[in-house]
Regions:
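Catalytic machinery of carbohydrate-active enzymes
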Residues: 1-324
Length: 324
């Protein structure tokens, strides 16, 4: 019945799961079945090697891998008919009596400074096969939007919020960057956010600060469902965001992006299309200008056509790139 993977976490974490799902598909030669919050199902539809777990493959898999130790995942694992149930945790202290009763194997692997995507990749399976590559998603189809939402001309998408208020950056800094983008020729600017009260307030403050600099933006906060947001982000000329799901999605969809980090450390990886800076960085405007120039010359967008069968059977990022 194939392999079942269970993860009940936020949207960004589900995106970061893509490389290890790709690896499992390569190792087993079959599509992986993922049990996650149902609202993230559109993300799964953009992973050709994975499908949302339903039917017998949900309840009677050949093997089960739980990639988080939360109660929802543990309950789902307990009611799955499968002898081989493996739990991955970052440290032994996370293991409880319930975990020992439910799982046949518990692997405690310290992240060691690795991000979630790389930690999962290194902790699951063997070192043979494809090498690690960051998350990759297919381009959302055209029917994932509605009339009047996605501009026809090149536009900037600003997503300045996430689930944590501590990651929010100064509206004045966003306004200054949007002024730079406007001067570069990107006159159409959209700002998006969720439906929390502070999301609306924060986006409104950014719009006000931007207006003072002579730039008008369109606020679509709380006005998109997930498929529409994915479509909108994938068609943007440039994405500006905080560290969170939007940043991971921009990377996975290969949309040029600038991510500001208000808390935590800035990733050391250097990628000319996906730049990370500490909030308040004095060179942000210069970096944005360079990002615009580089991304305009390196045209490496995902294919919009159907993927070959070889990519759907043990897909790897390198194979996907070669098929473009």
């Amino acid at each position: 019945m194939g392999e079942l993977v269970i993860l009940h976490k936020q949207l960004g974490d589900t995106v970061l799961l893509e490389p290890v799902l790709r690896k499992i598909a390569h190792l087993t030669g079959e599509r992986v079945h993922l049990l996650c919050p149902p609202q993230w199902r559109p993300i799964i539809e953009l992973m050709p090697h994975t499908q949302f777990a339903t039917g017998k493959r949900r309840w009677m898999p050949d093997r089960l891998r739980a990639l988080d130790s939360g109660g929802r995942t543990t309950r789902a694992a307990a009611f799955t008919f499968c002898r081989e149930k493996v739990l991955l945790v970052p440290e032994p202290g996370w293991v409880t009596r319930t975990h020992r009763a439910v799982y046949s194997q518990i692997d405690a692997v310290a992240p060691g400074g690795r991000d979630m995507a790389r930690w999962l990749w290194d902790s699951v399976g063997t070192d043979t096969g494809p090498k690690y590559e960051p998350p990759v998603l297919e381009r959302p189809p055209e029917d994932w939007t509605r009339e009047g939402l996605c501009p026809a001309e090149p536009f900037v998408l600003l997503h300045p919020v996430t689930t944590s208020l501590t990651k929010a950056c100064d509206p004045a800094q966003w306004a200054a960057l949007l002024r730079v983008a406007h001067d570069l020729g990107l006159k159409r600017i959209l700002v998006s956010g969720g439906m929390e009260a502070w999301h609306y307030e924060h986006c409104a403050r950014i719009a006000s600060a931007t207006k003072e600099l002579g730039v008008t933006i369109e606020d679509v906060s709380g006005m998109t469902v997930l498929p529409e947001f994915l479509h909108l982000l994938s068609r943007a000329r440039l994405v500006l965001c905080v560290d969170g799901a939007a940043s991971h999605l921009a990377r996975a969809l290969n949309v040029p992006s600038l991510t500001l980090h208000a808390v935590g450390s800035v990733p050391e990886e250097v990628n000319p299309r996906h730049v990370h800076l500490a909030a308040g960085a004095t060179n942000a405007a210069k970096v944005l200008h360079e990002l615009f120039t580089v991304s305009d010359t390196i045209l490496d967008t995902p294919s919009t056509g159907p993927l070959p069968t070889s990519l759907r059977e043990g897909i790897t990022g390198s194979l996907r790139a070669a098929a473009r």
